[in-house]
Amino acid sequence: MARITVEDCLKQIPNRFELALAATYRARQLAQGHTPKIESRDKPTVVALREIAAGQVGVEMLKKVPA
């Protein structure tokens, strides 16, 4: 099983703070029942990071957050 690292995700979202926000927001979505964009049996936080590293989700999801 391949391990996910922050460095893999930083290639997609270079700002660590935006990366943390995007991963948190996506992990919450997954925990609430949204469909994952990649196939994985991992916890929502790991799936969120895998999606970011794969380029499936990115910083654009922060612009969708309702105010």
UniProtKB/Swiss-Prot annotation:
Which GO annotations describe the biological process of this protein? DNA-templated transcription
Source organism superkingdom: Bacteria
Checking Pfam families in the record gives: RNA_pol_Rpb6
EC assignment: the record states 2.7.7.6
Q: Does the keyword Transferase apply?
A: yes
Q: Which InterPro entries match?
A: DNA-dir_RNA_pol_omega, Pol_omega/Rpo6/RPB6, RPB6/omega-like_sf
Q: Name one GO cellular component term.
A: DNA-directed RNA polymerase complex
Q: What reactions does this protein catalyze?
A: RNA(n) + a ribonucleoside 5'-triphosphate = RNA(n+1) + diphosphate
Assembly information from the UniProt record: The RNAP catalytic core consists of 2 alpha, 1 beta, 1 beta' and 1 omega subunit. When a sigma factor is associated with the core the holoenzyme is formed, which can initiate transcription.
Q: Which NCBIfam families match?
A: rpoZ
**Name of the protein in its database record:** DNA-directed RNA polymerase subunit omega
Q: Which gene encodes it?
A: rpoZ
